[in-house]
UniProtKB/Swiss-Prot annotation:
Family membership: Belongs to the histone H1/H5 family.
Chain intervals with Low complexity compositional bias: 1-11, 203-248
GO annotation terms (biological process): chromosome condensation; negative regulation of DNA recombination; nucleosome assembly
Segments of skewed composition (Basic residues): 33-51, 135-202, 276-287
CDD domains: H15
GO cellular component, one term: nucleosome
Residue ranges of every copy of the H15 domain listed in the record: 55-124
UniProt keyword terms in alphabetical order: Chromosome, DNA-binding, Nucleus
Function comment: Histones H1 are necessary for the condensation of nucleosome chains into higher-order structures.
Record carries keyword Nucleus: yes
Protein name: Histone H1
Molecular function in Gene Ontology: double-stranded DNA binding; nucleosomal DNA binding; structural constituent of chromatin
SUPFAM superfamilies given in the database record: Winged helix' DNA-binding domain
Length: 287
């Protein structure tokens, strides 16, 4: 009896050892499952492939091009920029307007653009770079200038003819005035001005002669006044003064004080005519 009991104890010990080995075998499969989960987590971390390459240039280049070409003093609005880009770039996404708004905000935050009210401008530092683009067009303009130079060479041929006309017209005094309107040489202007002055004085002297014939008493005072301007005039006016002085000696018999007094007397009768008319009526009534 005693010999059977130890055998039972050994069997129980073996049975207890068996589950431990089973537990140890169950742990390794759990590790392999974790390894699978780790590999699955790495797949989303891989970079995503873009569905298609964009057919339009970067947003900043499109916005910059729109602002430079529009050339608005206070900046270009979002609506104007979108309209310009839509006209120029035809292959744009459907949500282009929303993307453009986010890009504008992004560029303002990064100080690539300056926002003034509801308009967007380029900062002052980027304007010289933008001005370099139109600078390429200047050589084309320089090429067109040589073509315009032959026209300028043709014009000098017409100028000598224009100068010859005023030279021909400067001889008669009457034709000198239209020549002055056509912008002649500076020498023709003083000559045109001097001739009418010389002719105006003989007319004044000629006008003085009939008055002297009608009123011999008033002639001495007028001849003296005519002598003073003749000193400044040319020799032609001096001759007229000499002829006037020769006529005066024969008429010196007239009283000297009367010529100065008779001129105001002629003006006075016009005023005195009214006063005797009023006084004449009572005298006739008394008679």
């Amino acid at each position: 009896m005693a010999t059977e009991e130890p055998v039972i104890v050994n069997e129980v010990v073996e049975e207890q050892a068996a589950p431990e080995t089973v537990k140890d075998e169950a742990n390794p499969p759990a590790k392999s499952g974790k390894a699978k989960k780790e590999t699955k987590a790495k797949k989303p971390a891989a970079p995503r492939k873009r569905s298609a390459t964009p057919t339009h240039p970067p947003y900043f280049e499109m916005i910059k091009d729109a602002i430079v070409t529009l050339k608005e003093r206070t900046g270009s609005s979002q609506h104007a920029i979108t309209k310009f880009i839509e006209e120029k770039q035809k292959s744009l996404p459907s949500n282009f307007k929303k993307l453009l708004l986010t890009q504008l905000k992004k560029f303002v935050a990064s100080e690539k653009l300056v926002k003034v009210k509801n308009s967007y401008k380029l900062p002052s530092g980027s304007k010289p770079a933008a001005a370099a683009v139109p600078a390429k067009k200047k050589p084309a303009a320089a090429k067109s200038k040589p073509a315009a130079k032959p026209k300028a060479a043709v014009k000098p041929k017409a100028k000598p003819a224009a100068k010859a006309k005023p030279a021909a017209k400067a001889k008669p005094a009457a034709k000198a005035k239209p020549a002055a309107k056509a912008k002649p040489a500076a020498k023709a202007k003083p000559a045109a001005k001097a001739k009418p002055v010389a002719k105006a004085k003989p007319k004044a002297a000629a006008a003085a002669k009939p008055k002297a014939a009608v009123k011999p008493k008033a002639a001495p005072a007028k001849t003296k006044a005519a002598v003073k301007p003749n000193l400044k005039a040319k020799t032609t006016t001096a001759k007229v003064a000499k002829t006037a002085t020769r006529t005066t000696p024969s008429r010196k018999a007239a009283p000297k004080a009367t010529p100065a007094k008779k001129e105001p007397v002629k003006k006075a009768p016009a005023k005195n005519v009214k006063s005797p008319a009023k006084k004449a009526t009572p005298k006739r009534g008394r008679k």
